Amino acid sequence: MTGKMFGVATIAALAFGLPPALAQQSVKIGFVSTFSGPQAAIGEDMRRSVDLAVEHLGGKMAGKPIEIVYEDDQFKPDVGKQKSEKLVQQDKVNFVSGYIWSNVLLASLKTVTDEGDTILVGANAGPSQIAGELCNKNFFSTSWQNDQTPMAMGEYLNTKGVKSLYLMGPNYAAGKDMLAGVRRTYKGQIIGEDFTKWPDQLDFSAELAKVAAAKPDGIFIFYPGAHGVQFVKQWVQAGLNKTVPLYQVFSIDAITLPQQGELALGTLGAQEWVNDLPNEQNKKYVADFKSKYKVYPSYYGAQSYDAIMLIASAAEALKGDLSNKDKLRAELKKADFKSVRGGFKYNTNHFPIQNFYIQETVKDADGMMTVKTIATAVKDGKDSYYEKCQMK
């Protein structure tokens, strides 16, 4: 699923009676994600939410048709960089968005932002480097800095009297950030830590044996997508679900739950967006997504939806004239749109200042596996790296 996906732009043009020639006057957005391989479900969730955002906008921003160009990074940093180059140099997009993986985003950042005319609106990955020393005037995030979500979980565990914790995550940029995040706020004893091979390792039996021997009050993990599915299954198979409570970030969600099923019931996670947040924009987004796709959206999708709405807010404010990049950046920084998370504001490093919530894995009234909000862990949370950013 690579190259131009003309469906969105073409449908928008036809719906409003616009000739194909007007494609030159479109707002053109490149979207880099993983659309093949074992993690393709995440990319599909993001794509669905982008398409829904375009539908909610009536196919236009500031009177111009929206054109989305999807590219598959194949779960590889070098491929992600190549696809980003194509979007900027060949497709001449106004914006590039997407990026699930921190290593893919880090490989692609300069390729997109150093051109000067292209804005990168990251919809998921939030590596610490980009929040700090590598912050960039042409980069905006609609997600979070990697450390923040586990920091929220650490704060929550302190309130619940969890006295000892075992940490596990993959050995790459995001995994290191996630475990650093929970270490930053958790005040109990960390009695073990394992970084597993990424992305090849899907067998966690050796590490789980170490967890069983350590007998912590809980285990904290970060294993997104297919890795989270395997971890939860093996945690239960090892019998640890009866003795070691599981606390997680990005490991149990709308994408993984159809495969994890009841094995994940009762587990707790942290996130900046949950599908039951009560604001009107979120209610519409979740209801329309479920109606269209027969499943719940995930935070990957919610952040992608917000990325399109953020871009639309700036385009509308500038009446479709995206030529003045200083004005464009100023409008993006206002974050003047109805976010599905209920609103946020940008810090100086262009990462959101926002709330983080604790969610429990449950069954809904129809028996579908989902998550529900049980607590607000952090209000107006800032990341830990913004002071290292040269932007003020």
What are these regions (language model features)?
Residues 41-48, 56, 60-130, 142, ...:
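Beta-alpha junction/loop-to-helix N-cap segments that form part of ligand/metal-binding clefts
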Residues 18-23:
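Sec/Tat signal peptide C-region and signal peptidase I cleavage site
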Residues 87-100, 119-123, 164-169, 215-225, ...:
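Periplasmic-binding protein-like
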Residues 30-49, 71-78, 100, 168-176, ...:
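Extracytoplasmic "Venus flytrap"
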Residues 82, 128-131, 136-238, 275-284:
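Extracellular/periplasmic Venus flytrap/periplasmic-binding protein
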Residues 7-17:
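Bacterial N-terminal signal peptides
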Residues 234-305, 316-322, 365, 371-392:
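Extracellular/periplasmic periplasmic-binding protein-like sensory domains
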Residues 27, 333-392:
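Solvent-exposed, acidic/polar segments of extracytosolic/periplasmic ligand-binding ectodomains
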